Amino acid sequence: ACTGSLVLLSGCTDSSPLPPMAEGEEVVVVTRNTPTTYYFESDRASGFEYELIRAFAREYNMLVRIKVAFSLPELFEMLASGEAHLAAAGLSQSAGRDAQFVASNPYLYQQPLVVYKSGALRPRSLDALAGRDIVVLAGSVHVETLSALQQDIPELAWREIHAADSLELMHLVTDETADLAIVDSIEFSIQQQLLPRVVAAMEIGDSTPN
């Protein structure tokens, strides 16, 4: 199964520091600095989701102001407090997020993966995750996935890492300070070029809409 990418809308409240989003005005977008969302190349802002936001802004004659969050919890806090109108950051859909934010239609799907260091013990089943040192991004839907699995595998445990993207998780696996990491397939396919010894062991959970 797979997940998809979404744009989340904050729905500014009366106490929000921002005026409501309106045609011809400024739209404030919170994102992450990752190769799949927003980054600088030769002093020029780029990234798939950044280009989507620019296209949206052009359609409604808006100016774009970007804010960068350094972890998913920070991103969601900025959105919930009204510091941004939108979040565009390679976000996946989940029941928890749907209860708090309004999401766009998904525009791509990606599969969560368990990854490990080549040459280390490869897990081949969900039960084999028990007793392993697993890392996930704090605030990610993978935390929800693992929490659900823990109902059937009580020995399952993990560490939540506050980082912008999965590259830090993969570094922990490469450095052997973690056994396994849960990452999304699209980020993994890009980041693996930097860390080729980190390889996919198996899929976990359903693919999610972004």
Describe the residue ranges of each PLM region:
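Periplasmic-binding protein-like
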Residues: 31-34, 105-119, 166, 185-186, ...
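Short beta-strand->loop
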Residues: 40-41, 45, 132-139
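Flexible hinge/capping segments at coil-to-helix
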Residues: 105, 116-134
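C-terminal motif of bacterial Sec signal peptides marking the signal peptidase cleavage site
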Residues: 8-11
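Extracytoplasmic small-molecule ligand-binding "clamshell" domains
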Residues: 14-91, 95-99, 158-163, 171
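A ligand-binding cleft/hinge motif common to bilobed small-molecule-binding domains
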Residues: 73, 77-80, 88-100, 145-149, ...
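Short, well-ordered beta-strand segments
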Residues: 27-30, 115, 132-137, 181
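Secondary-structure junction motif
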Residues: 136-150
